[in-house]
Amino acid sequence: MMTTYLMRCFFRASTFILCFLLLSCTVKAQQKLNVAIAGLTHDHVYLIMNSYQKAEVNIIGIAESNPELVERFKNRYKIPDSLFYNNLPDLLKKKKPDVVLAYNAISGHLAVVEAAAPLGISVMVEKPLAITVKQAERMAELAAQYKVHILTNYETTWYPSNQELYKEVKESNTIGALCKIIVHDGHQGPKEIGVSAEFLSWLTDPNQNGAGALVDFGCYGANLMTWLMDGKTPISVSAITHQIKKDVYPNVDDDATILLEYPSATGIIEASWNWPFSIKDMEVFGANGYMQAVNDKTLRLKNNGKDDYKIYQAKTSKPIYSNHLSYLSAVLKGEINPANDLSSLSNNLIVVKILAAAKKSAQTGKKVILK
């Protein structure tokens, strides 16, 4: 009798545990984003593909017209034919994703928003938002009209070092009032580091990318400075550009220096395809000290009266700020308001204005006043 009773208890407990595990797996699966991909020509697409391989995201459709690219991705990631469409409108007639992720040329971002927004589908594009102010403002109009999110993804948004620097400077007032921000972003050059031919073709086309290093890397500094300056537009923008490797990049700049004027601070953006190694860092000077986000994890701090720098590792970011998928999920669920975040539409409208003014300044040799 006792043995039978124990067996029944064990069976019931096992059944309960099994049901619980199945339910947990189902909930977890439901929490994964269902995404559609617009374009495969931006090499950052490999990040989402890696997430797909790890079962961190559901890709329910891919819009790409280049048959060679389609075949390449189909074979490499074992993606079924049924997920591929020749264009985004056709895809969205058949599928209803949570969000569209754009991995196409910057000049094509507006078309992605025009296809998705009227259907109530939010969009995240790779940096920057657009190549012209007119395009960016049209995207903002569509976002407001159809009540969708238009977000921009930057690698540096998910750096724990940048997140911690912001908290120290803006919330803890560790170095006092900001007076200067310097941001360096660059590498040896896209061709030199071996980006794909499809990516290189539009990255070095001023009609598709807007410029060269000025846009490709200048956008990072404009994004971070707008964030640190509380979403304020700079008073003026000045810039100089160079074509150091004219034989490699004949149609666009490969080095840019951009100066942003604020009422009580100066921003300096250094962007290049000519550096001996890859770098993404940020320095901030305050009334009482200095901080540097040396890379994605390391910080450097020095206060007045101190002889040595304090060098330390940033704390791990909150889960929703650890990567673009977690952030997107939180935004779409209404768990956070992206109003002034690095990915926000308001921030990135200003970024596009800064880049447009920088191009004009470099062309004319004059300071451009922003209204």
Predicted feature locations:
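N-terminal Rossmann-like dinucleotide-binding module
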Residues: 25-77
